[in-house]
Amino acid sequence: MARKKIALVGAGNIGGTLAHLALLKQLGDVVLFDIAQGMPNGKALDLLQTCPIEGVDFKVRGTNDYKDLENSDVVIVTAGVPRKPGMSRDDLLGINIKVMQTVGEGIKHNCPNAFVICITNPLDIMVNMLQKFSGVPDNKIVGMAGVLDSARFRTFLADELNVSVQQVQAYVMGGHGDTMVPLTKMSNVAGVSLEQLVKEGKLKQERLDAIVSRTRSGGGEIVALLKTGSAYYAPAAAGIQMAESFLKDKKMILPCAAKVKAGMYGLDEDLFVGVPTEISANGVRPIEVEISDKEREQLQVSINAVKDLNKAAAEILAK
C-alpha cells in the first residue's frame, strides 16, 4: 500500500508539532513547507532524526516550493500572522487573506484533490478564503476550531469536577472567538448531563458559567501567560485528530468549521461555521443536532459575527 502524504503549510510552532505528531501516529510521509529559507529544511531534518529513536520509518522533507505539495492526501494550513499590538482587525484580515490566496493557488495547482484543514486565524473567514482561492469542493475543506475549543471545555470541566477528562464529553459550536457556544445541554460527564449535575448540586451554576466564559477566552489566556506566541500543542493535536479521521476513514463526529448549507441551524445562506461534523474518507458532512432555545439564540449571535467577518473580507477583496 502506498504511503499517505501529508503537507503542512507553515513550519512554525503548530506546523512543527503537527509534523511530529503525524510521525508518531505513523500517518504518512510529511512535507513541511514555509517561505522562510532553510527553516522548514532544518526542522524536517531534526524531525527525521527522531524516527530511529521513536521506531518509525517515514520520510520528512522541508521545502520552500509549492511543487513539493504535489499529490498530497492531506494539507494542513497554519501559515499566516498573529494579531499584534496596534494591528486592527482589518489589518490582520488583509494580511492573512493574501496569505490564503497564495496558499490556495499552491493547492489548486499541485494537490487539488487533497483534504484541506485550515488552522489560520481568524479561522472561520480564513477557511472560507482558502476555499475561494483553492477551488477545493465543500466536502474536502474544513477549519479546525471546535475540536480545540471543546478540548478546553472538557479540560476545565474535568478539573472542576475532579474526574478523568476521558469521562467528559463536551461540545462547542459557532465561530472560533468570543461568540462561540459551549453546549451545556448535550455535554455530559459519564452520561450525566451538566444540567443534571447542577440540579444535584455537584456543579454550581456560577462555576459552570465561569467555565463557559473561560472556554471562550481559552486562547487569550494562553497568549497572556506566554507573552510571546500562542497555543500550539493542543491546536496541533486537534488538527491531527481530524486528519487521522479522514486518512483512516474513522467517521468521527467532531466540532469543526465546515461549509453548512442554508436551512441547517436556521442559516439563510451557506456558511463556514463550527458545527458537529462527520469526517470520513469521503470528506466532511455537517450534522444538525438538537440544541436548546438559548443555545440557538447564542448560535445566531455567533453566526452573525462570522457574517460580519465575511463582509469585512469582501470589502478588502473589493479594494
Swiss-Prot record:
Gene3D superfamilies: Lactate dehydrogenase/glycoside hydrolase, family 4, C-terminal, NAD(P)-binding Rossmann-like Domain
One of the protein's GO biological processes: lactate metabolic process
SUPFAM superfamilies: LDH C-terminal domain-like (SSF56327), NAD(P)-binding Rossmann-fold domains (SSF51735)
Chain residues that bind NAD(+): G10, A11, G12, N13, I14, G15, D34, N96, I119, T120, N121
Annotated InterPro entries: L-lactate/malate_DH, Lactate/malate_DH_C, Lactate/malate_DH_N, Lactate_DH/Glyco_Ohase_4_C, Malate_DH_type3, NAD(P)-bd_dom_sf
Coiled coil, from the record: none
GO molecular function: L-lactate dehydrogenase activity; L-malate dehydrogenase (NAD+) activity
Pfam families recorded: Ldh_1_C (PF02866), Ldh_1_N (PF00056)
Top-level taxon of the source organism: Bacteria
Entry annotation: catalytic residues: H176 (proton acceptor)
The keyword ATP-binding appears for this protein: no
Annotated residues for binding of substrate: R83, R89, N121, R152
Physiological role: Catalyzes the reversible oxidation of malate to oxaloacetate.
Similarity comment: Belongs to the LDH/MDH superfamily. MDH type 3 family.
Name of the protein in question: Malate dehydrogenase
Species for this entry: Francisella tularensis subsp. novicida (strain U112)
Gene name of the record: mdh
